[in-house]
């Protein structure tokens, strides 16, 4: 199956909207968190770490951390964020405690309606086995199995690290980090400096309750010219979308066009052999050659 590069996938649009409606753990804009978009980001060429700062303040003005950490899927997700070496080329060492944390997270998300619906869909498509335990083993492999991102190096990366945590290429170029919780926590620790928003072409600026945004920021001095992220959604929602797109195709790069709420998106998933290389939502009306 070739990756879909243009037409809207109506089957996945319907499914993903049902998953959106089922995402009871999603945090509510203006109530559970507040963002401040501020200025529009400037152009930054690829591999440049110089960016005009169009935002004097952090993106996240407020997050109800008590509520966030009271939700089991968020709490177990947050426990995974400090388990990785940032640089590719530096071998990852996975401790028994970290394996247990990975399993606790998968157990938590597999109890949600979102992941049960995703599992049911994949079983119907013969892309997952009916047993929840078999599905958990499959998810562990897709997301947490280590592989070498730098040629000739020891295993130094995995899908989860790239997408949800972020990593760097020789400390000079940042990669991944498409998750709002990690963005918030790194911003709170002063590791992330938000530079401004990248607007959709048909919209002069995003709204502060938008739940898909294109952002420019620096992370430990490395600039991300444009990084896209869902905002407020639960970890299980993102896991479900990216896993479904990954399993739907053997293509190296899958780009499924979907309509989700008010957004027209490409869900982009890059395959690293049998594992996820990267995954993110791309707002389709943003034509920027230096994305991601």
UniProtKB/Swiss-Prot annotation:
The active site is at residues 162, 178, 224. One of its GO terms (molecular function) is metal ion binding. Its EC number is 4.6.1.-. Its main location: nucleus. It catalyses: uridylyl-uridylyl-ribonucleotide-RNA = a 3'-end uridylyl-2',3'-cyclophospho-uridine-RNA + a 5'-end dephospho-ribonucleoside-RNA. Monomer. This is Poly(U)-specific endoribonuclease-B. It comes from Xenopus laevis.
């Amino acid at each position: 199956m070739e990756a879909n590069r243009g037409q809207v996938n109506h089957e996945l649009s319907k499914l993903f909207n049902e998953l959106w409606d089922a995402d009871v753990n999603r945090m509510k804009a203006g109530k559970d968190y507040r963002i401040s978009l501020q200025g529009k980001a400037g152009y930054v060429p690829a591999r440049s770490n110089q960016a005009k700062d169009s935002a004097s303040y952090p993106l996240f003005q407020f997050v109800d951390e008590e509520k966030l950490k009271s939700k089991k899927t968020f709490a177990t997700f947050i426990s995974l964020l400090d388990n990785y070496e940032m640089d590719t080329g530096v071998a990852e060492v996975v401790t028994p405690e970290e394996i247990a944390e990975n399993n606790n997270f998968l157990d938590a998300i597999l109890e949600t309606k979102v992941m049960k619906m995703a599992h049911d869909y994949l079983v119907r498509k013969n892309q997952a086995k009916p047993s929840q335990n078999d599905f958990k083993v499959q998810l562990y492999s897709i997301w947490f199995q280590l592989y070498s991102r730098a040629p000739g190096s020891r295993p130094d990366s995995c899908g989860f690290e790239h997408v949800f945590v972020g990593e760097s290429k020789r400390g000079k170029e940042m990669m991944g980090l498409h998750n709002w919780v990690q963005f918030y926590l790194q911003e709170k620790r002063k590791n992330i400096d938000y530079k401004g928003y990248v607007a959709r072409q048909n919209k002069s600026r995003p709204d502060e309750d938008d739940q898909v945004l294109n952002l420019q920021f620096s992370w430990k001095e490395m600039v991300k010219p444009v990084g896209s992220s869902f905002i407020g959604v639960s970890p299980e929602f993102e896991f479900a979308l990216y896993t479904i797109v990954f399993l739907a195709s053997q293509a190296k790069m899958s780009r499924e066009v979907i309509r989700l709420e008010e957004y027209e998106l490409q869900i982009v998933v890059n395959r690293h052999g049998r594992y996820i290389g990267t995954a993110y939502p791309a707002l389709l009306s943003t034509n920027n050659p230096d994305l991601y």
